[in-house]
Structures are given as structure tokens and as C-alpha cells.
């Protein structure tokens, strides 16, 4: 799974399991056209039967007769007998998340779309059951020092990389986004689909943009939620995005009467807490309850604060957690951070695939001494990724991968105004590059991933369902007006009266 100091940096969801072997072996001559036989299957948390199948693809596109891998595909069938010919294909985030494992949440998210359109889920190569590149390092009851120790995680990654490279499909250069999107179009062909509606979330937006770059004629509509274009350099962007999201927490608290009365010096307490590190702390483990003493560093603190910022609901607990930490009580902060990371069990990401993508597509473009060093979060993520990617095999990329050509089909881009991972500035750049076919909606008081919030589900449905392209674009603005009323959750207040809760205003001690 993804190392613990990186969990929470990438979009995740509720996880389901899908069984099935993955084969990788010398293959017979490839057929002239891909074939994909579907059979009835049951997916966890999906109420109706789905249809599942496997499409064989070459591991190395340059060697079509060489080692083959199996791409696992699931189709959630439309309810109506007369279904629309253009299904929805959902591209999961990460990088490293299985789309099929999210079948339950996706079926709930796209309930209206499923009335008349199939929803297609493909486990991208390296994820789920499609030549999985997983690292078996999930031990929820590890000590806190082990859980947040970057050096220890680097050793785990090195061992995992060595193991993965021994797999029959262990050429880690063959898991880049451009290759994966060629796989996706092979699935489209095998299903006999002329055009489809492409929906991507977080890293899935990068993949969707790459799919459109390679196969523009095959896209009917596109929805991008939490936009992470190829030129974003993911490890470097998090510090500035997280800083802006944290400042928004403090600003909102200062403007809210109850929050300000309870936490009048929240920002100062945070700064004092940072200034007190590194320091030895004693914390009860959130899962075992056993007290543990370890040295808390700024990097560890940042890794705990970042995950709650993804959702304003969890971020609303940060003023209380910071107050208690400034008083020497770190249980709330540790519990909040680890809970947002997946409860110590990760977010279901295939670590090997994650690094095969980031090490090839992002790390070579990282520049030292960037804006991250000026933030409270620092450049620890950059340094960790540089070290992890130092010996990781890197796939080749076409120069055009980092470009966004004008869109031929309507594109809806969605951003959360306080998203620490994919702030709206990136979607705005992409919208300008896509041209007049693109519409960008920024949802106030929202974090990473907004498509499932309130009226946004209906906005997406109407955008996809409208037969006329011009009308689909024109009505989005009016439909999305409901998003302007999205409230920010109020700050979590302690059980004690404000005067007692805020008695310690002098910072860390």
C-alpha cells in the first residue's frame, strides 16, 4: 500500500474487493482486433448484477507479441431497456486506485446516469487485479514512530521495488499514463463503443486529459473533478495547496463568532507548535491505546495535518486539535490525521503503480528550492519522492503528454475552493487550454472531490444527459448556481466552555 507518510495525499474512496487472477506470460500472436467476453458477476456494495471480463494487452506496446497482462473490466448495466449508446467510463484517482474496487460508491454517485447509460470501470494496469503492483506493508498496529518514519518507509519501498521487478510483468517502465490510456481505448474498441463519456477524479483527471489528447474523436463529454494536469508536478504542489487550505481554516475561524471565541489564537498556537519541533511527545496509539514516546518532527506534523484538510468536515476539527497539541496533548491531532489517512490501513492504492507513474511523470520535472520551502509544510514530500524515485525505473513519455490541446467535445471541470491537493488554479489553466468547449465551476467551502456534494450530482447528470452540446454547456452555469450556497462546516467545539478551552494561549510548551 502507499507509504504512511504519503497516505492522504491522493484521492481515495470506500473500498470493495474484486477477486480474480492476473496472468502474465508469453502470449500467442495477438488477434487482429481485441476481444472482451463479459460474464455475469457480483461486485461488493452493488445491488444488481454487473458484467465482468478480461482484455489481454501487451505489457510493452513496442513488443505486441511479448509478455501479456490481463486488464480487468466491469460494466454496471443501465436500468432502461433502451439504453443510450454512449456509456460513462470512470477513471479512478491515485495514481494507484482500482476503479472496480470503487464500484459501490460509484454506483451510488451515478445513480441517475445508470438509468440510461452503462457505467464502465477498468482497473488501470498496475491496480486492482490488472497486473497489480502492490506493496504488502499494511500493519495498522505498528508503533507511531514506525508509522511516521520516512527512513523506514524508504526501506519498505526498496524491498517492494525489488520484489515487483521479479514478477512476470515487473518491467516498471510500462505503467505510465499514456500506455494506460491506450489500454483504455482498446477496452472501448473491444466493447464496440463508438464514443463515451469520460469522468475522471483527481489523478483520474490527468488520465482523462491524456485520453482526450490521444483519442479526441472518442470523447462525447468529459467531467474532471479535482483537476491534476500532467504539468502540475504533484509532489511539489501539495505544500502550497495545503498552506492555502490551512490558512482558510484559520481565516474562517477568525470570522466565525463561536470559533473565534473558543480559539482566538489558533494561528499563533499553530506557529508556536511548529517552532517547538522536533520534540519528544507521548501519545496513546489511536488503535491500541498504548502510550508511546517518540520524537515528533515538522515533517511528521505536516503529514498529520494535511489529510484532514482534504475535506472541510475533518478540517473543522483542526483548531481543537491544534489547541490541545499546544497544551501537550497530541491524541486528537494524531487520531485525526491517521483517521483521515484511512484509519491506518491506507487508501487502497497500489504503491508500485503509484511510484511508476510519479517517478516517470512528475519527479524529473521537480525543481529544487521552490515555493514549498516557504510554507509551513516545507519540502519534505519533495525530498521523500526524490529518494523513493532515485532507483525506480522510469518509463519514456512523449513530449506532447505535457500539453492540453483544444477540446472537441464539451468538458466540465469541477474544483473545491479550499482543495489542498488540486486547487482551482490548475483547473483554470486547463480550461483556458481546452478553449470554448470548457466550463469551470469552483465550489466554495469545499475540498478535494466535489462531484458527490449536494446538487453537484444533478449538475453532472444534466451535463452528460443533454443531447445537444451547446445546451449542455449553456445550462451548466445556471445548474451550478446551487453550489454557491455550499456552507462550510462550523468548527468543532470542545465540551468545556470557551474560556476554559482557551485558557492556554501561550503556544506550545
Where are the predicted features?
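Bacterial N-terminal signal peptides that target proteins for export
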Residues: 1-13
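Long, low-complexity segments enriched in small/aliphatic residues
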Residues: 322, 327-367
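Structural motif
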Residues: 285-303, 310-314, 344-352
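N-terminal signal peptide c-region/cleavage motif recognized by signal peptidases
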Residues: 19-21
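Helix-loop "lid/cap" segments that line or gate small-molecule binding pockets
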Residues: 307-308, 360
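Short helix-capping/linker segments at secondary-structure and domain boundaries
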Residues: 309-327, 364-369, 397, 468
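Gly/Pro-rich cap/lid or specificity-loop segments adjacent to the active site
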Residues: 27-300, 356-509
Amino acid at each position: 500500500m502507499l507509504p504512511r507518510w504519503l497516505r492522504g495525499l491522493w484521492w481515495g474512496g470506500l473500498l470493495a474487493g474484486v477477486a480474480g487472477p492476473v496472468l502474465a506470460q508469453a502470449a500467442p500472436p495477438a488477434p487482429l482486433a481485441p476481444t472482451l467476453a463479459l460474464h455475469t458477476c457480483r461486485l461488493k456494495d452493488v445491488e444488481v448484477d454487473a458484467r465482468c471480463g478480461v482484455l489481454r494487452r501487451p505489457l510493452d506496446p513496442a513488443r505486441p507479441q511479448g509478455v501479456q497482462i490481463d486488464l480487468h473490466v466491469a460494466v454496471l448495466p443501465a436500468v432502461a431497456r433502451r439504453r443510450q449508446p454512449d456509456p460513462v467510463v470512470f477513471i479512478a484517482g491515485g495514481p494507484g486506485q482500482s476503479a472496480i474496487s470503487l464500484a459501490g460508491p460509484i454506483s451510488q454517485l451515478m445513480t441517475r446516469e445508470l438509468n440510461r447509460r452503462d457505467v464502465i470501470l477498468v482497473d488501470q494496469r498496475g491496480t486492482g487485479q490488472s497486473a497489480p503492483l502492490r506493496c504488502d506493508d499494511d500493519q495498522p498496529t505498528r508503533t507511531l514512530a514506525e508509522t511516521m518514519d520516512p527512513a523506514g518507509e524508504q526501506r519498505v519501498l526498496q524491498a517492494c521495488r525489488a520484489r515487483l521487478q521479479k514478477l512476470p510483468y515487473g518491467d516498471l517502465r510500462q505503467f505510465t499514463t499514456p500506455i494506460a490510456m491506450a489500454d483504455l481505448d482498446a477496452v472501448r474498441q473491444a466493447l464496440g463503443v463508438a464514443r463515451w463519456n469520460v469522468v475522471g477524479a483527481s489523478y483520474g483527471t490527468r488520465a482523462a486529459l491524456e485520453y482526450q489528447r490521444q483519442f479526441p474523436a472518442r470523447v462525447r463529454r468529459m467531467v474532471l473533478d479535482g483537476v491534476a494536469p500532467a504539468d502540475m508536478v504533484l509532489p511539489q504542489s501539495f505544500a502550497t495547496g495545503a498552506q492555502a487550505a490551512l490558512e482558510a481554516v484559520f481565516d474562517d475561524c477568525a470570522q466565525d463568532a463561536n470559533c473565534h471565541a473558543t480559539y482566538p489564537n489558533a494561528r499563533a498556537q499553530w506557529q508556536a507548535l511548529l517552532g517547538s519541533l522536533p520534540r519528544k511527545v507521548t501519545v496513546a496509539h489511536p488503535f491500541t491505546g498504548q502510550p508511546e514516546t517518540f520524537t515528533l518532527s515538522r515533517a511528521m506534523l505536516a503529514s498529520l495535518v494535511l489529510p484532514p484538510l482534504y475535506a472541510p468536515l475533518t478540517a473543522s476539527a483542526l483548531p481543537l486539535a491544534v489547541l490541545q497539541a499546544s497544551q501537550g496533548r497530541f491524541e486528537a491531532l494524531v487520531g485525526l490525521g491517521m483517521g483521515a489517512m484511512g484509519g491506518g490501513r491506507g487508501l487502497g492504492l497500489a504503491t508500485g503503480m503509484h511510484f511508476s507513474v510519479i517517478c516517470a511523470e512528475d519527479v524529473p520535472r521537480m525543481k529544487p528550492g521552490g515555493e514549498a520551502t516557504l510554507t509551513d509544510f516545507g519540502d519534505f514530500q519533495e525530498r521523500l519522492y526524490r529518494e523513493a524515485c532515485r532507483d525506480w525505473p522510469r518509463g519514456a513519455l512523449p513530449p506532447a503528454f505535457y500539453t492540453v490541446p483544444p477540446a472537441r467535445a464539451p468538458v466540465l471541470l469541477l474544483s473545491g475552493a479550499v482543495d489542498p491537493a488540486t486547487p482551482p488554479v490548475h483547473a483554470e489553466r486547463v480550461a483556458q487550454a481546452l478553449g470554448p468547449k470548457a466550463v469551470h465551476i469552483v465550489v466554495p467551502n469545499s475540498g478535494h472531490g466535489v462531484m458527490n456534494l449536494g446538487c453537484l450530482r444533478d449538475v453532472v447528470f444534466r451535463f452528460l444527459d443533454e443531447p445537444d452540446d451547446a445546451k449542455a454547456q449553456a445550462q451548466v452555469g445556471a445548474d451550478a448556481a446551487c453550489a454557491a450556497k455550499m456552507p462550510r462546516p462550523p468548527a468543532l467545539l470542545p465540551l468545556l466552555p470557551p474560556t476554559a478551552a482557551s485558557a492556554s494561549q501561550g503556544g506550545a510548551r
